[in-house]
Amino acid sequence: MCVICFVKALVRVFKIYLTASYTYPFRGWPVAFRWDDVRAVGRSSSHRALTCAAAAAGVWLLRDETLGGDALGRPPRGARSQAQCLLQQLRELPGQLASYALAHSLGRWLVYPGSVSLMTRALLPLLQQGQERLVERYHGRRAKLVACDGNEIDTMFMDRRQHPGSHVHGPRLVICCEGNAGFYEMGCLSAPLEAGYSVLGWNHPGFGSSTGVPFPQHDANAMDVVVEYALHRLHFPPAHLVVYGWSVGGFTATWATMTYPELGALVLDATFDDLVPLALKVMPHSWKGLVVRTVREHFNLNVAEQLCCYPGPVLLLRRTQDDVVSTSGRLRPLSPGDVEGNRGNELLLRLLEHRYPVVMAREGRAVVTRWLRAGSLAQEAAFYARYRVDEDWCLALLRSYRARCEEELEGEEALGPHGPAFPWLVGQGLSSRRRRRLALFLARKHLKNVEATHFSPLEPEEFQLPWRL
């Protein structure tokens, strides 16, 4: 055999090896990381995920510690007799059964269509091509993670830390949370990956090769083991982790930053504040009571509530042609420039009202609401310019307030990983005009408009890290 033929044969064998590495049945893969692998190094109790038994009870148990609410199923307070409790349970039983049946049939297919086996089979060639591209072009490393509920999570890691010219973005890891019909093989990770960041993609339980059924509690368990894998096996410091959630992925993204507040940043793309308004939009009006109950008990994607629990930098990407997360109209095409019904608007208002309640009182909320109605980048810029916002003055005011808080809280735990804890009472004593200008400044720093539809791939230059004061 000549030298050239030998080289060709060697290249062919190498390609066969690479192909086998990602087409080999996932169930036969060795486990790379388990949720309890970090117990030996003293895992913090505040990062407790759901146990297998607790997973069946829902994500509420997990939210109880962080949000400070009452856990679902906690015995009612007061002196109610056992007979009254039993009677109440019997009255609610038909509704609970109907809600359970809807959630485990049509509901799950509507909320997580990517888990339908027929869709997975139809997309299998594209998924294999996507894996091939990530492995061969970006040297992706596939790994199997096991969550606390026993689900096996399929992940792909692209390490850009040693990539030439990646000294700016490469040291940061972007954990990508896909939508309800997204897979890491062909999902939202392409934008941060092409922008030069290290990227960790994963599939929801029941999506692709990941096992299990996609319910919020199982999604939270999967996200928990993914974050632990990034911290303890891939060895990225918490401050270098950026969580990026697209669409329904905003739930797991906000859950991660709520549970791990020391993570570096959060980017939410084309997501919403709450699932109930969107569910009511597509379901019959006569089903309203059943739909609300089903969502609250089985698909409580409370993105806004979880978002307000994260103290770090946040950027919201609102797509101006997005008809999926919009409640404008009912099952009709979205008219150009109609962004008033986009649920990302409520997400921004909830965030700003939590962080800056004085600024967002009355005049502040009103002016931000009008600014959010701008249907194009030109209209947005014109509205902003009309109020003559002095950005230097806004920055100086915010930095001065933060410095005073840091002096008062020096050495105390209240300072937190991102500085003084929210809410900030900055803006007291300001005139109405100045509060409006400060509110507009903060809104523009936390939300960026992208002229695209819900399913359009995000351009690499559109993916940016959030603003830091």
UniProtKB/Swiss-Prot annotation:
GO biological process terms on file: monoacylglycerol catabolic process; phosphatidylserine catabolic process
EC numbers on record: 3.1.1.111
A Pfam family it matches: Abhydrolase_1
Gene Ontology MF annotations: monoacylglycerol lipase activity; phospholipase activity
Active-site annotation: S247, D322, H418
Reactions this protein catalyses: a 1,2-diacyl-sn-glycero-3-phospho-L-serine + H2O = a 2-acyl-sn-glycero-3-phospho-L-serine + a fatty acid + H(+); a 1-acylglycerol + H2O = glycerol + a fatty acid + H(+); 1-(9Z-octadecenoyl)-glycerol + H2O = glycerol + (9Z)-octadecenoate + H(+)
Database matches in Gene3D superfamilies: alpha/beta hydrolase
SUPFAM superfamilies associated with the record: alpha/beta-Hydrolases (SSF53474)
InterPro entries tied to this protein: AB_hydrolase_1 (IPR000073), AB_hydrolase_fold (IPR029058)
Cellular component GO terms, alphabetical: nucleoplasm
EC category name: hydrolase
Keywords from the named record: Hydrolase, Lipid metabolism, Phospholipid metabolism
AB hydrolase-1 domain: residues covered: 174-298
Role this protein plays: Hydrolyzes the sn-1 position of glycerophospholipids with high specificity towards phosphatidylserine (PS), PS-PLA1 enzyme. Also hydrolyzes the acyl chain of glycerolipids with a preference for the monoacylglycerol (MAG) 1-acylglycerol, MAG lipase. Plays a regulatory role in cellular lipid homeostasis by modulating genes involved in neutral lipid degradation and in phospholipid synthesis and composition.
Family: Belongs to the AB hydrolase superfamily. ABHD16 family.
UniProt-recorded name of the protein: ABHD16B
UniProt source species: Homo sapiens (Human)
This protein's encoding gene: ABHD16B
